[in-house]
Amino acid sequence: MGIFSIANQHIRFAVKLATAIVLALFVGFHFQLETPRWAVLTAAIVAAGPAFAAGGEPYSGAIRYRGFLRIIGTFIGCIAGLVIIIAMIRAPLLMILVCCIWAGFCTWISSLVRIENSYAWGLAGYTALIIVITIQPEPLLTPQFAVERCSEIVIGIVCAIIADLLFSPRSIKQEVDRELESLLVAQYQLMQLCIKHGDGEVVDKAWGDLVRRTTGLQGMRSNLNMESSRWARANRRLKAINTLSLTLITQSCETYLIQNTRPELITDTFREFFDTPVETAQDVHKQLKRLRRVIAWTGERETPVTIYSWVAAATRYQLLKRGVISNTKINATEEEILQGEPEVKVESAERHHAMVNFWRTTLSCILGTLFWLWTGWTSGSGAMVMIAVVTSLAMRLPNPRMVAIDFIYGTLAALPLGLLYFLVIIPNTQQSMLLLCISLAVLGFFLGIEVQQRLLGSMGALASTINIIVLDNPMTFHFSQFLDSALGQIVGCVLAFTVILLVRDKSRDRTGRVLLNQFVSAAVSAMTTNVARRKENHLPALYQQLFLLMNKFPGDLPKFRLALTMIIAHQRLRDAPIPVNEDLSAFHRQMRRTADHVISARSDDKRRRYFGQLLEELEIYQEKLRIWQAPPQVTEPVHRLAGMLHKYQHALTDS
């Protein structure tokens, strides 16, 4: 598809974006707002942002949720800006520097929270900076400006939501239903591959794809939850299905690993059974019914524990899947499944990455301040705002450099486009609200097409063009002011890009090591006799960390296999019948403390020392298990875990 071609599926959102812009423009001028531009800009960003992220029309609820986050971020930023101004109005330079630190602090938080919620914190950072910079000539008008800014933003968000509702947004429910069916078939096919014990690379690709698809289904659940409250029951079921899908992956991969040392555990009965190919969810349903009969006939003791656990999880998955598709009332059997174990939240492994983002944002804002004060340029304030916007938004994403380039391309494209509107279109349409609305609707329509195609610079061009054309009340046309604003945007983006290049992010290897050590800590923490601790559900958190590892190190199969082995060890030890006595309980606590020291160690020497101590404690623990006559279900997983840690100790301790 060419850059300027229009696909049918893109037209509806383009009309939706144009409608949001026109509504915000009309309401802004109708209520005599001082700067309707902010309402129009907000409507455009709230509507276009999810479309750019999705690469097409966003699903129902995405625009509303983004608008909600923007309101929260704006209010937090306005309150922070007011507090900073009240406390430091007598020291303007210090006030701006504190604002720069506040922007960095918000970026630091946004790097640690969930990616969906990070938008609010990024917005809070640069909103405070915008307020502080804008009120420099008249600081006594700060409360009035903050109220006006909040009002204009709320109007823009409401207009974007109304436009979204007018053009019947897509529901994600049908996609969820199809993915649930397809995912079950893929889970069965993974188990077939693992029982055949064929090529390891094929198995690695299969389980890696399933981890990504399960994570994608979790994202769909979030969208469905945002869409409407009527999907509350489906949302509860999908949350449990996430854990069940991860359990199926874990049991399949453990079946494969067991055959490396004890292939006789998988009998010919099960090998022949899983030879039957499946194509649809109905085929899987028939096979599961037959498999349950086989297990009932052979007995639980004669069935490998991984296959028995896999069938139990697949049966629960199937039951909840039917409930999601029909969205019927939750019955007693489903309620028992949904009342499962509480999920555990783990500490972020990206703290060093978050600190790099803090310094990038803070230093770029301070650099912008120095540039503004040194040059005395009237649009230095505009450059500072763009610096804060680019760094706050770029830092949340996997590739900040490309986001900064997108903004540079967008601001460059906005210069001729804004020039056309400033010199020709708006002066000739300002006497007619209808013509003015049509002219901006055309801009929104065509940029809406390009935003959905993720054309480099399209999102930046949309925001930058609206920002520099005259949409104030009353309209004034000063060419020097327009040129200053346009050049200020470009200079701000270039300065932000320069700081991103200079402050290098070398946290990738450290993050990978912390993630692997967190897997080790989780496996060690599973060795416990505490009933409450054994009931905790670590699986979603562990696979979330594995997904992050896969994104940080694409194609690094040894790391993925090591992480998956730790997850399998955690699940097996969690269910192992460890003898209950005070001696073992005290030693469990000691090993957990040592594992925590491995994660928190700041130097390689300390980390190696604590890791060596952990290996010694595992040897002592195995001896204690023999003394207390622990069954093979306990001793074998512990022995495998100790062997893995010995084998990979350099990868787990060296920077």
UniProtKB/Swiss-Prot annotation:
Q: List the disulfide bonds.
A: none
The annotated topology with respect to the bilayer is: Multi-pass membrane protein
List cellular component terms (GO). Answer: plasma membrane
Chief localisation class: membrane
**What is the annotated localization of this protein?**
Cell inner membrane
Q: Which domain of life is it from?
A: Bacteria
Q: What processes in GO biological process is this protein linked to?
A: carboxylic acid transport
Q: Which UniProt keywords apply?
A: Cell inner membrane, Cell membrane, Membrane, Transmembrane, Transmembrane helix, Transport
Query: What are this entry's molecular-function GO terms?
Result: transmembrane transporter activity
Q: Where are the transmembrane segments?
A: 13-33, 38-58, 69-89, 93-113, 121-141, 152-172, 370-390, 407-427, 431-451, 455-475, 482-502
UniProt xrefs under InterPro entries: PHBA_efflux_AaeB/fusaric-R (IPR006726), PHBA_efflux_pump_AaeB (IPR023706)
The UniProt similarity line reads:
Belongs to the aromatic acid exporter ArAE (TC 2.A.85) family.
Q: What does this protein do?
A: Forms an efflux pump with AaeA. Could function as a metabolic relief valve, allowing to eliminate certain compounds when they accumulate to high levels in the cell.
Q: HAMAP family under this entry?
A: AaeB
Q: Any idea what this protein is called?
A: p-hydroxybenzoic acid efflux pump subunit AaeB
Q: What is the lineage of its organism?
A: Bacteria, Pseudomonadati, Pseudomonadota, Gammaproteobacteria, Enterobacterales
